[in-house]
Amino acid sequence: MTEVTNLEIEMIQGPFNSISTQVFVRANPTGFAEDNLAGQSAWQADWRIAGQISGPYCVHSETLPAVIAFQDQGDGAGLLAAARIPDPCAWTARLPATYKVDVELTHAGQRRQQSQHLFTFRANEIRQNSFYQTDLNGNYRRWVLRCVQHPLDDALSDGGEQFREEGLVCIVINPTMEQCNLATLNGVVILSIVQQPDIEKTISAVKELAVWGCVTACVIVGDVEIKDTDLNNVRIPVGCRVADVSESLPAWAQFCIVDVASLSNASAFVDGQQMPVIVSDIQPFEDCRAARNQCAVLQKNVAAEGDYAGYCILTTNKD
């Protein structure tokens, strides 16, 4: 009998609109012991993936969750099932809608693995040199990020209310899965700083963060050389810090963060970027309102140089 141990389950968001969208669950074929498949695919060897998705759930609003079963998609690379969700709700800070996905793997009708996952529909994306949010009806609005480096646990102490009221994004270095879960449920948006010692751990961290609705984007820092192909199929914007504006940006970067002190020498650099540019500064602040004000001051101070995709207030300078 073919054995399988803790197969990785991938959840995929299909194209969406306000009427319906599809969600796919997939078990990677590399998780099966190929020598036990006797040249067959996992599906031909009588493995199946099934389950259901329920939701939306939201702590800030009353919802009427629906339950939709996943339908097997037949033979192919790995195991794949799909469910069509009516009236999908995208995750936002104001309305942090989540879905529960229950998945089970069976062999010859016998359950071999069972797991539950949190799923969210993303409503933000990059277009040209800005971030945008959609209402799922095909309407997009430009979203200027106003980010502050702040302890996430403190931001969540009041259920994220102050961060939501001020429209702030919380900059967090290597957030834990528990923190991401709480931020997703409570509506606190995170800009994650990914700082890992090697390529493998960096890519793994980005992929783990990409499943959380609260993580709007990741910024990779440190001396790791990543190929653009390493981040294929990652459903989240990935950017970099710019230490030297005279150097080329990595091919994988979809946006960048530039220190305000470099702007006077970076006009040509900024004008030449076909991607969002976020300006950062190091300033103290006492609370969320003061942090939001610091973002406004930074925006005003650099208005002559350009209209940027976002403004970050840091408490330390993370390279």
Where are these regions (language model features)?
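Secreted/periplasmic carbohydrate-active enzymes, especially glycoside hydrolases
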Residues: 1-319
